[in-house]
């Protein structure tokens, strides 16, 4: 953020400028404006397709839309209400899921459509299609290997990007990411959190239920209290063993 006023900026530009430098600056400014104009045209075209797609759906009008309260970045954001369009298509506010962005919503709408949940029997089959479920190889009741197959799925990549944005997030999903990262590593945390987001996404749309953070897992405070309780029990056990040894 620029802290200087317009007057200060204008005054700092006063001076003797070479003609070729001014020409280069003018060219760069014109190019920037041209690119912004093309981006705005793309936004309008995308919105036009969303309007047409929404009109084809046999969905009754719903006035129960409630905008999520999380902060949404405005840098390079589209200039139309993606959150409302997604709600009109899926009838739940997917933007409420931590890590979900307007760009992610647009990609999921374009790749999945409105009735994708009917094409998967279970949430597990959907996550498996996203390539977010490890391919467990079991022999004789023993787990030999558990790796996620190396195949590309665009929607799966979207959920991975959503998971990556939760590294410092203070929601339960953010705590979940950091807990898995401390135990298994960064890559495993990305896949595990993306899997969890995908399950929430599918369940919300399949059951037409809004996002409920209380059902996504324990928060960091509860986890800390559990660790304190377990540590206290271990200390008590050690104290008892020490008392027996000293007798």
Model-predicted segments: where are they?
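A detector of single, family-specific signature residues
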Residues: 1-247
